[in-house]
């Protein structure tokens, strides 16, 4: 929550974690604190498929990429809106790695919830992601990701239905893509593919390339550049304060 703000009709940033077999826990988080300091409430949901809540909860995410793992996020938005805590017309989604995928899926698959999306090192073409993992990490990696995505390997036609790049024409909101050029976890091309798909569909997109940076944004100067780019994009497309109504004549 923004310091000193009344918990009512706040602008919201949904910040899903990466992994997806990971979790958010109470404690200092530099990214959410940076956003809260700019006036945004921040929601960090532990959606199904997150780790640390037992095997059943983890496996509940299998086959739910772009599906229930995604609607867990938008259900959180609807719950906060129903309680009057946030303004449902002022919500954006921001995330890195799997969270970046979720941000792109919020723009292309589970649409109508967000005003803008920021993906940091997020996969967009899942068929290519599987092929890259098989080539670089072996068949075990292919099986792991296929099981989590709920697909039958690289040739499964359902991959297109959960790949944001294949659904780029469904986008109705501005998208920012941020990616380290030297990322060896999620290849930089995953963001260029998404940027090309959005441009081909005539959709608004910005691509921020972090030269010499890895998947985790290990260098402080590029981490700062990511934050500055994200905040500027959010303030442009989802201002943290609503304009005052014009005075009556």
Protein language model features and the residues they cover:
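Short beta-strand-to-loop junctions in surface cap/lid or active-site-entrance loops
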Residues: 1-8, 163-168
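Short loop/turn elements that form and flank the Walker-type P-loop nucleotide-binding site
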Residues: 9, 29, 38, 171-172
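Short, Asp-centered acidic motifs that coordinate Mg2+ and/or phosphate
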Residues: 11-12, 41, 116
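Alpha-helical transmission elements in cytosolic ATPase-linked domains
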Residues: 15, 27-30, 109, 193
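Short N-terminal helix/helix-N-cap motif within the alpha/beta-hydrolase-1
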Residues: 23-26, 189
């Amino acid at each position: 929550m923004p310091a000193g703000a009344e918990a009512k009709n706040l602008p919201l940033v949904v910040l899903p974690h990466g992994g997806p077999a990971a979790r958010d826990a109470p404690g200092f988080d530099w990214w959410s604190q940076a956003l809260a300091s700019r006036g945004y409430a921040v929601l960090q949901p532990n959606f199904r498929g997150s780790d640390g809540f037992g095997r059943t909860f983890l496996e509940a995410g299998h086959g739910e990429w772009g599906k229930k793992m995604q609607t867990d996020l938008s259900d959180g938005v609807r719950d906060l809106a129903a309680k009057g805590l946030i303004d449902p017309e002022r919500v954006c989604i921001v995330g890195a790695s799997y969270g970046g995928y979720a941000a792109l899926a919020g723009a292309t698959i589970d649409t109508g919830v967000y005003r803008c999306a920021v993906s940091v090192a997020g996969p967009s073409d899942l068929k290519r992601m599987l092929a890259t993992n098989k080539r670089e990490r072996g068949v075990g990696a292919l099986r792991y990701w296929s099981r989590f995505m709920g697909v039958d390997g690289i040739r499964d036609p359902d991959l297109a239905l959960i790949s944001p790049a294949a659904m780029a024409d469904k986008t109705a909101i501005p998208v920012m893509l941020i990616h380290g050029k030297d990322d060896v976890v999620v290849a930089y091309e995953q963001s260029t593919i998404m940027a090309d798909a959005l441009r081909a569909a005539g959709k608004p997109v910005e691509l921020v390339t972090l030269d010499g940076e890895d998947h985790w944004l290990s260098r402080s100067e590029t981490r700062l550049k990511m934050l500055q780019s994200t905040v500027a994009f959010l303030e442009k497309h989802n201002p943290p304060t609503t304009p005052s109504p014009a005075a009556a004549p």
